[in-house]
Amino acid sequence: MDIKSLMNTKQDILRSNLQILIDHPVTKGDQCESAWIEFFRGFLPNKYAIDKGFIFDSKGNISEQIDIIIYDALYTPLVFCTNSGEKFVTAESVYAVFESKPTIDKTKLEYADKKIKSVTSLYRTSREMISSGKRVGPRKLTPILGGILSVDSVGIDTISKHVNRYKGIDFGCAINNFTFHVRRNENREFLSLITSSKDETILSFFYLILDELYKLGTVAGLDIREYAYATLEQFKIERGGV
């Protein structure tokens, strides 16, 4: 078996698993996020956690409810969980967020963009760290990626027309149609739109997500002191050192 046949088999498995989950009565309709969460958990490395919920910062701001959050599983100290399974995740810990809908169209793109911007507008800290015994300065904050996921979609020409306006959206996947990737410059201005064929939708999305997450590396270390200052009235953690 050659590598192409191997990866095509991987695509068939991913597509089949995702279709089964989405067609299940529990997830059918507008609330398909659990199917996509299981999809991501099925192939992303263990350094990533995937959940639904809210994202908050040290200033007391909270995002809108997010269908799928990909966040750091190793260095995320403040994750709270509701009885319904929704997580509250620190803004510094987030790699990517997604909105899940049955169909992608102009209204859904606008809605997803609004949700994504409720996350990317949050305040994030960055702190010095010790690496290999040496002090390293605070890392530059990495972008928080945003996307939309669905079963079906309007045509790619319509997508291209609107993602120029909705700058929070970096990519999307409609499993019955295509995967798309929006290329932007440092100012989030539209450069081009890359799309997959229908036959390669899932595998293209698989490679795209892995590549984009790899390029981010590891999120910056959050400054826990900022959260302490915001929540403690008497006890204060001293600044200084790392």
Where are these regions (language model features)?
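Intrinsically disordered, low-complexity Ser/Thr/Pro/Gly-rich regulatory segments
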Residues: 1-65, 70-242
